[in-house]
Amino acid sequence: MRIPLLCFGAMMALFFVGNALCASSPYPVVKPDPQAVAVATKWLSAVDAGNYAEAFTMFPARIRSAGDAMETQWVGYQRAKRTPLGWTLSRKLVKAWFTRTLPGSPDGYYEFFHYNTSFQRKTQAAESVTLTKESGHWQVSGYRFR
């Protein structure tokens, strides 16, 4: 039980550090990689539909390998925090950043997307999605909304 909680804490740290960079990034704004945008869009569609367990399966193996407790915690958090916002009415990608380094994470390829989003019960919201390129494929490794 202790290991999944530690892994959940590490995953949440990656989410918040990575997505905090989206809000005010020291990295240059870039034209987003179309493949990364497609992955983020597919992942957000699963979240929008309330398919949180499906969205969890799209995380990198290093996050999924923490086990069922990690998935249960992540799904529970999304149900408690994201579900009450209601349907997604609109979403617009407004900024994208790229970096090879991320505090607390191995060097690699990271893209950060910042969206202006309107939900059924929160008309002005911001979403941040962090993507990691592993084994040549983009995967969502972080998500935050406010």
Predicted regions and their residues:
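Bacterial N-terminal signal peptides that target proteins for export
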Residues: 1-8
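Short, low-complexity N-terminal intrinsically disordered segments enriched in polar/charged residues
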Residues: 4, 18-49
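Bacterial N-terminal signal peptides
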Residues: 8-16
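A general secondary-structure boundary signal
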Residues: 31-35, 58, 126
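Short solvent-exposed beta->alpha transition segments
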Residues: 37-38, 45, 53-109
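Internal amphipathic alpha-helical segments of the cytochrome P450 catalytic fold
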Residues: 52-53, 137
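Exposed beta-sheet edge and beta->alpha loop/turn motif
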Residues: 94-146
